[in-house]
Structures are given as structure tokens and as C-alpha cells.
């Protein structure tokens, strides 16, 4: 653990880009005033958005509903696990539970 790199993120993208409508980007809007600038993979399906990125040598996979009031996240342990989680998300086979986001 803690040996995931941005190259691993691009490896996940390379495995899935021809199968699913996913994108790689270098920034994410947090709200009306802030953005985060780092490579991340983004996917939209069945009213939810998925983000996969590398943070501190670990994969982080976030899923949020369309209203941005419910979500969850987890840490795939490797490229294979991340690719499998995203494929399941895109095919509607995910079984994770969404939790309320705290009010800001």
C-alpha cells in the first residue's frame, strides 16, 4: 500500500477508455470558488459521478449522487481493483451504500 502513482491512474484509464465513456482531466471544481488541480478519472452513470485519483500513494475512489447530497469513497488497492470497481460502476453492478454528506 502507499505505492500508487499517477502512472497507475493512467494505467486504469488505458484499460477502460475504449470500453466506457470516461475522461481524464487535470482539475475538479470543488464549488463556485475553488478548484483542485491534479490528474483524475471521471465517469458519470445512472445519476451518479465517480472520481478516481491518487493521493498520498493510495487510490481514492469517490462516488456522489447527482444532487451531491449522498456519497461514499473507498481505496482500491491496485490497478486491477480500481479498473474492476469502475467497470462495475459503469455496468450498474455496484453494491456500495451512499451516505448523507454533512451540511457545510
Feature names for model-found ranges:
Residues 47-84:
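Intrinsically disordered, low-complexity regulatory segments enriched in Ser/Thr/Pro
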Residues 85-92:
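Short, compact, well-ordered microdomains
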Amino acid at each position: 500500500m502507499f505505492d500508487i502513482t499517477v502512472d497507475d491512474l493512467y494505467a486504469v484509464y488505458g484499460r477502460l477508455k475504449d470500453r466506457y465513456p470516461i475522461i481524464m482531466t487535470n482539475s475538479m471544481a470543488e464549488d463556485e470558488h475553488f478548484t483542485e488541480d491534479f490528474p483524475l478519472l471521471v465517469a458519470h452513470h445512472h445519476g451518479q459521478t465517480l472520481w478516481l485519483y491518487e493521493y498520498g500513494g493510495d487510490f481514492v475512489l469517490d462516488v456522489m449522487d447527482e444532487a451531491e447530497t449522498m456519497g461514499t469513497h473507498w481505496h482500491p488497492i491496485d490497478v486491477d481493483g480500481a479498473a474492476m470497481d469502475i467497470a462495475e460502476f459503469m455496468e450498474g453492478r455496484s453494491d456500495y451504500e451512499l451516505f448523507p454528506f454533512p451540511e457545510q
